[in-house]
Curated annotation (Swiss-Prot):
It is found in: Nucleus; Cytoplasm. This is Serpin B10. The record marks R362, I363 as: Reactive bond. A motif (Nuclear localization signal) lies at residues 74-77. It holds the Pfam family Serpin. The keyword Isomerase does not apply. Its main location: nucleus. One of its GO terms (molecular function) is serine-type endopeptidase inhibitor activity. Belongs to the serpin family. Ov-serpin subfamily. Keywords: Cytoplasm, Nucleus, Protease inhibitor, Serine protease inhibitor.
């Protein structure tokens, strides 16, 4: 499971860099865990070069030394044997079970779906394996004759799976009579902070978009003993904010320079992120924290981004090899749709009962101020598995 978490986290960074190329100056929010899980469901039915490309993009090659070398990255070809592929899917099975454990103190609603044109029927074994490893069921639908109704049905299902928070995932032109197969992945998250902000301390403050312009935000404030890490190059400060029971943590990285986010995003690597956010790098401070309230709800049509990362054959009718899921030739992936929703506020989401008092050992710690009044990146991490569930960039209220 550790190597799978490494793969997901590496994918998070590579994917975020691709999004940053086209979404300059825009907010970003996606779930690398959600996207990886959905694509792994398709990977289960791929063979040949299609499988090789998907494994490479999803970082299923677990050799971290190879990953860390820019020279080797271009040359890397991932051909995994059946035992390795089996380990990957068994890893997802365990990871899904851990992250969706009913005893967790957070809510994570996920909609993962594979919809294939019914004239390309799925193998029974593929259907059984998807249910075993991912708890999902591929759907055979009639895109040829009823594509718009299928789109509406998919949207209704996603909306119900996410407690109404994610309606209309597929836009009007998302599918048509020529659609062969689409993937959908939508996630809604809510959690309570370990230390909640006081609503009375929230005030309107300027959020500096760059050195010359700003927008008003509702800025939350608290003074608490929190774990902090410092980054020397590029200069930035990181902070760990735990959710209830420390099942999850929000890791925020704030560049020192108002316009330093672009440099940080380009420079950050998997190894650096692992080092920065390790327990060894964390120091306890009394932190005067100022963090904007915000809600992020981002939708992505992933076809272009994934193809540009090297996963092109899956979307090409003449090259795609999905013979592991269907006997019919010319089956290919028409598109992948992803949407995530998160709200950051004083409570995390809803106020918790009986949280009025806090007992702590009175140890004098150095005091620092962290004022997130300019663009920053953040991660929501599942601590037990060290998996990045969500990646976000907040740069425009």
């Amino acid at each position: 499971m550790d190597s799978l978490a490494n793969s997901i986290n590496q994918f998070a960074l590579e994917f975020s860099k691709k999004l940053a190329e086209t979404d300059e100056g825009k907010n970003i929010f996606f779930s690398p865990w959600g996207i990886s899980t959905t694509l792994a469901m398709v990977y289960l039915g791929t063979k040949g070069t299609t499988a090789t490309q998907m494994a490479q993009v999803l970082q299923f090659d677990t050799d971290q030394d190879v990953k860390s070398s820019p020279e080797n990255e271009k040359k890397r070809k991932v051909d995994l044997n059946s035992d390795q592929v089996g380990e990957i899917h068994f890893g997802f099975q365990k990871l899904i079970s851990e992250i969706n454990n009913p005893s967790n103190t957070y809510v994570l609603k996920t909609a993962n779906g594979i919809y294939g044109e019914k004239t390309y029927p799925f193998h029974n074994k593929y259907i059984e394996d998807i249910k075993t490893y991912f708890g999902a069921k591929p759907q055979s639908v009639n895109f040829v004759e009823d594509s718009d109704q299928i789109r509406k049905d998919i949207n209704s299902w996603v909306e119900s799976q996410t407690e109404g928070k994610i309606p209309n995932l597929l836009p009007d032109d998302a599918v048509d009579s020529a659609t062969k197969m689409v993937l959908v992945n939508a996630l809604y998250f809510k959690g309570l902070w370990e230390h909640q902000f006081s609503v009375q301390d929230t005030t309107e403050k300027p959020f500096r978009i760059n050195k010359t312009s700003s927008k008003p935000v509702q800025m939350m404030s608290m003074k608490k003993n929190l774990e902090v890490f410092h980054i020397e190059k590029p200069q930035a400060t990181g902070l760990r904010l735990d959710y209830k029971n420390r099942d999850l943590s929000l890791l925020l990285i704030l560049p020192e320079d108002v316009c330093g986010l672009d440099q940080l995003e380009k420079a950050i690597t998997y190894d650096q992120l692992s080092e920065w956010t390790s327990e060894d790098m964390m120091e306890m401070y009394t932190v005067e924290l100022h963090l904007p309230k915000f809600k992020l709800e981002q939708s992505y049509d992933l076809k272009t981004t994934l193809a540009s990362m090297g996963m092109s054959d899956a979307f090409n009718q003449s090259k795609a090899d999905f013979s592991g899921m269907s006997d019919e030739r010319n089956l290919y992936l028409s598109n992948v749709f992803h949407k995530s929703f998160v709200e950051i506020n004083e409570q995390g989401t809803e106020a918790a009962a009986g949280s009025a008092s806090e007992i702590s050992v009175r140890i004098k710690l150095p005091t620092i101020e962290i004022n997130a009044d300019h663009p920053f990146i953040f991660f929501i991490r599942h601590n037990k598995t060290n998996s990045i569930l969500f990646y976000g960039r907040f740069c425009s209220p």
